[in-house]
Amino acid sequence: MNNKFLIASALCMNLGATVNAQNPIIQTQLTADPAPMVDGDTLYVYTGHDEDGADFFWMNEWRVYSTTDMVNWTDYGSPLDLSSFSWADDRAWAAQTIKRNGKYYWYICAHSKLSGGIAIGVAVSDSPTGPFKDALGKPLFDNGQWDNIDPTVWIDDDGQAYLYWGNPHLYYAKLNDGMISLKGGVDPKEAIDDKRQVGRIHMTVDGFGAPDVENRDSTVKYKDNYTEGPWFMKRGKNYYMLYAAGG
């Protein structure tokens, strides 16, 4: 993309609350990858769920919690799991929900039975707490690679929605207005496919703490280099990205 991003690294995201709140805010489930969404006067937090006793990132479902005061939380259980996607069979990892035109779109990543890689899918609902259903009946993006993780979506002021994801590379795509298909038209210098549906944002030390992975010096210890979990926002004329960093 041609925009100049101001980058902020986030080693972790703490959705704790006021001095009266009890931390961790979720104590009855092993949750990961909190993704906040504000709708009206309510904050919703969408999470993954680590299985008890697992020795890897064994995760089969996503969960939803909400609060109106940052102290008291409501647990809505799991309105979305791997069985919601006929093409998925493992690794219900980091995901995000966003509202548009009265509907709620939950962008997820999971292991694909179709390709053997990690694929990105999208579920839709009329309510922020579900029920959600697979919007496509197939992955939104699936190229057989493992690095299609941590999808997030951001909508610019002009209404164009963007999908971001990736580890250790940072990928993006434009979404159509319906939010469930790729629009194409990414910068040809960044496109990774002939249809120009998906682009890769190239990294620099100034922008991301390190150059692209293939250009890194194994003898250099880079600081705060991009790893995964890209979250975009805009304030004034500047675009910001927060991400999970490794050093």
What residues fall within each predicted segment?
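Bacterial Sec-dependent N-terminal signal peptides
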Residues: M1-Q22
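Carbohydrate-active catalytic/glycan-binding domains of CAZyme proteins
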Residues: N20-G247
